[in-house]
């Protein structure tokens, strides 16, 4: 190949594939904790510089090409919904659009030329977490305008958020910088302004996905982050790690592999 994938990228992707394609007999005893929600989350911990975006491209290619080849296989989906933490990241993720001029699938040889037509059968939507926000009944009650329409139903909400993908079912969600997406712990409320803002963002992000899952079903939610921690109120950060991490290539690993420059 012209472009060799990093070991950490292959390790991450092979783990995700194995969790779906391996026989159940091989997965006996493996129990991946839930985040407490109704849809499944899987987290890949990969340090900055480890190539998370390329792994996302590999994940999308694997999902879409398999679904295009085996339409009846419910383990796969051709509908990909990517949530970014900001406009800058969202712009950077445009390389995951299958028809883009600078797409990673062709640029890094993720998909052979002969399979590009199958890949293009998929639909990839990239949005910002703010797009998941909606007005609650409480917020509507405080509205001073004459517009007193109630909160949107899940169906209306999903149609607005998903747009051209509104009729999709069994959607694969990819959370980039997923440490911004966690379920609020009632026993650990944010105290500072920054903590309250982080809590608000996390609540909007995850609750929005809950509504999408309720109306359209989320096949699986794949989290990517270099720092997948959620506030726990405990002094030991390790206790705040996402419980659903399935592969871990941290900062020290990245430095040893030469993917990350040694801090001075």
Where are these regions (language model features)?
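RecA-like P-loop NTPase motor core of helicase/translocase proteins
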Residues: 1-264
């Amino acid at each position: 190949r012209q472009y060799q994938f990093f070991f950490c990228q292959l390790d991450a992707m092979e783990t995700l594939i194995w969790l779906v394609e391996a026989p159940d007999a091989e997965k006996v005893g493996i129990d991946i904790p839930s985040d407490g929600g109704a849809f499944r989350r899987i987290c890949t911990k990969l340090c900055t510089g480890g190539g998370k975006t390329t792994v996302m491209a590999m994940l999308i290619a694997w999902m879409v090409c398999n679904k295009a080849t085996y339409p009846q296989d419910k383990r796969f989906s051709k509908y990909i919904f990517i949530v970014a933490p900001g406009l800058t990241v969202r712009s950077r993720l445009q390389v995951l659009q299958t028809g883009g001029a600078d797409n990673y699938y062709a640029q890094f040889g993720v998909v052979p030329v002969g399979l590009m037509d199958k890949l293009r059968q998929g639909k990839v939507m990239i949005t910002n977490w703010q797009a998941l926000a909606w007005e609650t009944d409480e917020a509507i009650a405080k509205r001073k305008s004459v517009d007193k329409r109630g909160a949107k139903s899940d169906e209306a909400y999903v149609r607005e958020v998903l747009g051209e993908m509104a009729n999709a079912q069994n959607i694969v969600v990819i959370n980039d910088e997923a440490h911004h997406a966690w379920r609020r712990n009632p026993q650990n409320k944010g105290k500072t302004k920054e903590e309250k803002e982080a809590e608000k963002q996390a609540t909007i992000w995850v609750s929005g996905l809950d509504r999408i899952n309720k109306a359209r079903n989320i096949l699986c939610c794949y989290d990517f982050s270099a720092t997948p921690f959620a506030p726990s109120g405990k002094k030991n950060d390790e206790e705040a790690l996402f419980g659903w991490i399935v592969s871990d290539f941290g900062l020290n690993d990245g430095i040893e592999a030469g993917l990350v420059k040694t801090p001075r």
